[in-house]
Each structure stands twice: as structure tokens, then as C-alpha cells.
């Protein structure tokens, strides 16, 4: 199978073809996703909650991300593999570069970092040194203590304009992808149309170029609170492989996420 690349997603945006992505943390699920044609995966710091059982992503370490990245890469050798840099792993550009090198050696094609304009120098440093960067704006879970919980971001003109400004700044600095989490559909549309790079949404409506879900949400095995934007595809299909295919089909057709999964 031909490897999926950042250029593959850029072409999807140009062709207005929606694409699905998903989190993965181990060999077996990564192989299953790849076998079904789901070839863009994220080793997210969400593993702190879904795999390790913490109540936030904050305890996750670079070593944790590298371990799971290596496992996923073995299961999906041709996927486009993103890896989160966890909390406090990119407080300075130099620290970001050192930690990015660790997860890239483990098998990542790209690192994802949370934050806006304050990350411009970090994004420049990484991209100039051949480390592709995916930005992450909106609800950034590593900032949960500042936000006071998991809340929709970017409501109101001022907040929306700031997120758009952040997105443009990250793109100008060299970011090649952007994740938008828990923002109003109207703002997600503005940002997606303003950027040349692909935008991946989670809780941002069906107006972004791609979608991502935490795999546990997609299969209905999340403990505790279920996010509004989540959909249990396993409940509808009764089979994990069929659930993956259904998720991909609904994203590509624009059926998912629906109005019931979106914010305004």
C-alpha cells in the first residue's frame, strides 16, 4: 500500500474530499484501522485518560507517547502518523525540538502541539529542522485548568477573531495541519476557508476538511462523560471493522458530524 502523506491530505482539501482520522495507541488497533483504509492516525495524549486512567492528559510523558507511537507504527507502517507533544514538552523551542526528535525516532511523521501565536517561534524552529507540525486550537485539553473545564471555545466576535488570528499565525510559521476542537460551526467554517492547510475538526461541525475521533468514543467504550460530538459507530454496526468503515463513510459524505454533534 502506498504511504499516506501530508500531501495526500492537501490534495483532499483541494479536491474538497473530506477525510477521516482517528486516535490509535497500540499495534492491533492500528493494523485494523490500516486494513480498513483508515490511514491517518494520532497517538494522542488522550491516552492519559483512555489508556492510563487519569482524569486529564497532564500526567502523560514524552516517553509514554514514544512507546505508543512505536507500537502504532509497527501496526500501520504506511499510515500518516501524528504524535502529540504532551504537557510541558514544548515550553521552549529547544525543548520542543528535543522531544519532537524522540517521538519522530519512534515512528511519528508529524508532531501536534496545542496553542496559538505564542508558539510561532517553536513552529518555525521545528519546521526549519524538518519536523512537520500540526497545530491545535479551540479546546486544548492541556489548558483545562485555565479554561476551568472542558468548554466550547471561540464564542463571540473577539474570541473568534483571536482563534482565526492564531490559526493564520501558525500557518504562516509553517504548520502543515490544524486541529480545531470544540468551536462553533460558523467559526470552524471561517478558519477552514481562510487557511490553505487542511483543517481537522473534533466538535467543530462537518465544515472542516477532515474529522478526528478518539477511538474509544467511536466505539462507545469511553468511561464517564461522553462528549456531545461523539458517536458510537459500533452500536449501529455490531462489528468493529464495520464501525470503522461506517465512520469513514459518514465523514466522507458529510453525514457525520450532524447537527446534534455540533456547537453554535
UniProtKB/Swiss-Prot annotation:
Any one GO CC term of the record? cytoplasm
What's its EC? 2.1.2.11
Report the locations given in the UniProt record.
Cytoplasm
Catalytic site residues?
181 (proton acceptor)
Q: Which reaction does it catalyse?
A: 3-methyl-2-oxobutanoate + (6R)-5,10-methylene-5,6,7,8-tetrahydrofolate + H2O = 2-dehydropantoate + (6S)-5,6,7,8-tetrahydrofolate
Instruction: Quote the record's cofactor note.
Output: Binds 1 Mg(2+) ion per subunit.
Chief subcellular location equals cytoplasm
Q: Which cofactor does it need?
A: Mg(2+)
Listed A to Z, the keywords are: Cytoplasm, Magnesium, Metal-binding, Pantothenate biosynthesis, Transferase
Q: In which pathway does it act?
A: Cofactor biosynthesis; (R)-pantothenate biosynthesis; (R)-pantoate from 3-methyl-2-oxobutanoate: step 1/2
One molecular function GO term is: 3-methyl-2-oxobutanoate hydroxymethyltransferase activity
Say if the entry is tagged with keyword Transferase: yes
Q: GO biological process annotations for this chain's record?
A: pantothenate biosynthetic process
For binding Mg(2+), which residues are annotated in this chain's numbering? 45, 84, 114
- Which sites bind 3-methyl-2-oxobutanoate? 45-46, 84, 112
| Family of the protein in this entry | Belongs to the PanB family.
Subunit details for this protein?
Answer: Homodecamer; pentamer of dimers.
Under PANTHER family, the record lists: 3-METHYL-2-OXOBUTANOATE HYDROXYMETHYLTRANSFERASE
Under what name is this protein listed?
A: 3-methyl-2-oxobutanoate hydroxymethyltransferase
Q: Which organism is it from?
A: Shigella boydii serotype 18 (strain CDC 3083-94 / BS512)
The protein's gene is named panB
Amino acid at each position: 500500500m502506498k504511504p499516506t502523506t501530508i500531501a495526500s491530505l492537501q490534495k483532499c482539501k483541494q479536491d474538497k474530499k473530506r477525510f477521516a482520522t482517528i486516535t490509535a495507541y497500540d499495534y492491533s488497533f492500528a493494523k485494523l484501522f490500516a486494513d480498513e483504509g483508515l490511514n491517518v492516525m494520532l497517538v494522542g495524549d488522550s491516552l492519559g485518560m483512555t489508556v492510563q486512567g487519569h482524569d486529564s492528559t497532564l500526567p502523560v510523558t514524552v516517553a509514554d507517547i514514544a512507546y505508543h507511537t512505536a507500537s502504532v507504527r509497527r501496526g500501520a507502517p504506511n499510515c500518516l502518523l501524528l504524535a502529540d507533544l504532551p504537557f510541558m514538552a514544548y515550553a521552549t523551542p529547544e525543548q520542543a525540538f528535543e522531544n519532537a526528535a524522540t517521538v519522530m525516532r519512534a515512528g511519528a511523521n508529524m508532531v501536534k502541539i496545542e496553542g496559538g501565536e505564542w508558539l510561532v517561534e517553536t513552529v518555525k524552529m521545528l519546521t526549519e529542522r524538518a519536523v512537520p507540525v500540526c497545530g491545535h486550537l479551540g479546546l486544548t485539553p492541556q489548558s483545562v485548568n485555565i479554561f476551568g473545564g472542558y468548554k466550547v471555545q471561540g464564542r463571540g466576535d473577539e474570541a473568534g477573531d483571536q482563534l482565526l488570528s492564531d490559526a493564520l499565525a501558525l500557518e504562516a510559521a509553517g504548520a502543515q495541519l490544524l486541529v480545531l476542537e470544540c468551536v462553533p460551526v460558523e467559526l470552524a467554517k471561517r478558519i477552514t476557508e481562510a487557511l490553505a492547510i487542511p483543517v481537522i475538526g473534533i466538535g467543530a461541525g462537518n465544515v472542516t476538511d477532515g474529522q478526528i475521533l478518539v477511538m474509544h468514543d467511536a466505539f462507545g467504550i469511553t468511561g464517564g462523560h461522553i462528549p456531545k460530538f461523539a458517536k458510537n459507530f459500533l452500536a449501529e454496526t455490531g462489528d468493529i471493522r464495520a464501525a470503522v468503515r461506517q465512520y469513514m463513510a459518514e465523514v466522507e459524505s458529510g453525514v457525520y458530524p450532524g447537527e446534534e454533534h455540533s456547537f453554535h
